[in-house]
Regions:
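Mobile, glycine- and charge-enriched loop segments
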Residues: 1, 19
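Short beta-strand scaffold positions
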Residues: 3-4, 52
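Acidic, PIN/NYN-like endoribonuclease modules and their adjacent C-terminal/linker elements
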Residues: 5-6, 10, 14-17, 31, ...
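Conserved BB-loop
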Residues: 22-34
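Short beta->alpha connector loops at strand-helix junctions that form conserved
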Residues: 27, 53-54, 76-77
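Acidic, metal-binding active-site segment of PIN/NYN-like and related structure-specific nucleases
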Residues: 36, 44, 48-63
Length: 109
């Protein structure tokens, strides 16, 4: 399962679903307004890979907050990109990593 934090636009999550990915969002999980640490803990407790547009999140993970126990983070920047472009980039990244464990990894889309 992919957990799209509150920085990920809902239409991006919907586009990934249309491509067959299991995605839930911070809106659906009612975690809007949570800190990055709380989003990370929420995903870790459920074993969900996190999708984020928030580069502060990278500092949190790279800084050792969750050591190597986090279920994986997929990061991409939304700046200057359309929803369609983002969906394609993220889908392509997910396809390349299909079946591979992302625990402790940060993947850039």
């Amino acid at each position: 399962m992919i957990y799209a934090d509150e920085n990920v636009w809902v239409p991006v999550a919907e586009g990934l679903r249309r491509r067959g990915w299991e995605v839930t969002t911070a809106v659906e999980e009612e975690t809007l307004g949570h800190t990055d640490e709380e989003h990370l803990e929420y995903a870790m407790q459920r074993g969900w890979t996190i999708l984020t547009f928030d580069d502060d999140f990278l500092s949190l993970v790279e800084g050792g907050y969750a050591s190597s126990n986090h279920p994986g983070v997929i990061f991409t920047s939304q700046h200057g990109r359309t929803v369609g472009e983002l969906v394609k980039r993220i889908d392509s990244t997910l396809q390349r990593h299909r079946g591979r464990e992302l625990t402790g990894e940060i993947v850039f889309a």
